[in-house]
Amino acid sequence: GSIVQPPLQRLKSIDQWQSVATQIRALPEVNVVSPAANGSALVVRGNASRAITVVGVEPELYFRIVPMPEKIVHGTARITINDILIGTELANDLGVSVGDKLRVTSASGSANTLSVTGIFDLGNKAANARTTMMALRSAQSLLGLQGGVSALDVTVHDVYGAELVAHRITKLTGVEADSWIKTNEQFFTAIS
């Protein structure tokens, strides 16, 4: 039950995302609102390069939605500004382990060298090959989203009320909200 998001063609930040997040957080049905900067990038190690999906998050919020620490098989789920978490497939593919450095470059031309602090298993081969996770600030600068976010990940208390909440959020903020079914809770993403 992992979330695999379609790659965004062009990244634009949600307008006034801080105030949108505050409005969503104020809804009694809402449990967690986690800002994210997600996009496509290339990871380079020696002469090997792979296409990846970058998920930039604030761990103290995002880990309440997706319990990454439980999915770590090597290392820890630490994400500071210089860290990256990668999946088991990508790690095997590139021959990297915890402590190794990876160069990540994006379509916008930005590049960053990050240390692998943790290797995770999302229970899905494709996700383990493509998904990488880093600090929100690292992803923002890499993806050319300075100070912006491409998504707000939201969980609600009541699984069955999620569609309704998504609809309310769209009406309230003008931000489109999509529902995702995830394991036993409803999880959705608001995108601009």
Language-model features: locations:
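Solvent-exposed, non-transmembrane alpha-helical starts
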Residues: 8-15, 44-46, 62-67, 80-81, ...
